Amino acid sequence: MRLFASHTLVAAALATAPALLSAQQVQGVKERVFSASERVGSGGEVRIYARQGDITISEGTGSTVEFRAEKDDRRGRLDEIGFIVRKDGDGVTICAVYADDDDCDADGLERRSGRWNWGRRSLHLAMTVKVPRGVHLRTSSGNGDVSLVAGVAEARVSSGNGKVRISGVNGRVDASSGNGEVTVDNASGPVQARSGNGDVTIGTVNGPVNASSGNGDIRVRMDKLSGSDDMEFSSGNGRVEVVVPSDFSAEVEANSGNGRITTDFPITIRGKLSPSRLRGTIGNGGRRLRMSTGNGSMEIRRAT
């Protein structure tokens, strides 16, 4: 399995794989604390990937990425985890890898053996990273919380099992957790947020926003909203609350399996009026707003 894998491997890539794998240098295998720093050009990309462990990212100064990882070996061995640092063009990739079984590139982590030995993967890892302002960031942990507070140009952040918290991003945000809360605050670009099992809370300066949860509440606040992009909010089991500017306009489609739908805005109803199903127009219409929940109330509120 590859974290953040997005490209199909082709025969030509496979033919050169042995040379690439053998060239990867795993560092810090026997060290309790590992540090690395790399310069990244303006607008460059920073990628931090880990099978497990908490990742805390903040804004640094200058044009250097500063990475520090601390191993807690009370329930495991120091040599379970090592690190691969790869500089490529105007970007850098840093991976925390299971030293005998992982490979690392710009798209993420990949296991060599295709098998997983859960019994000895018990070492806990805590990573802190300082990144230059304005970089593009991609980061993921297979099992751990991920926190980002930095004025990066855009961010793609995920956890397989942990909380995701993001604040201050100046552009697009893509945030997800397989099992944990997702919180995005003070974002000034489009936001896409997902949780398989947890609440999703978003506060943006400008929007638009799309959010979903398999089992959790969705709370979204947009102080401003430019453009006419469609938005969708859905929960399998939870309340959905969307706060929008007072000049908001949209074609609304809302459905609740078991709950009421309310709005602060005058709305022109289309079709049959129902407490759990709503079709109508707010303001001048335009963008499409879709909302749904299997079990919970839905609210469209006016920002104050």
Residue ranges and their predicted role:
Residues 1-304:
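Intrinsically disordered, low-complexity terminal regions
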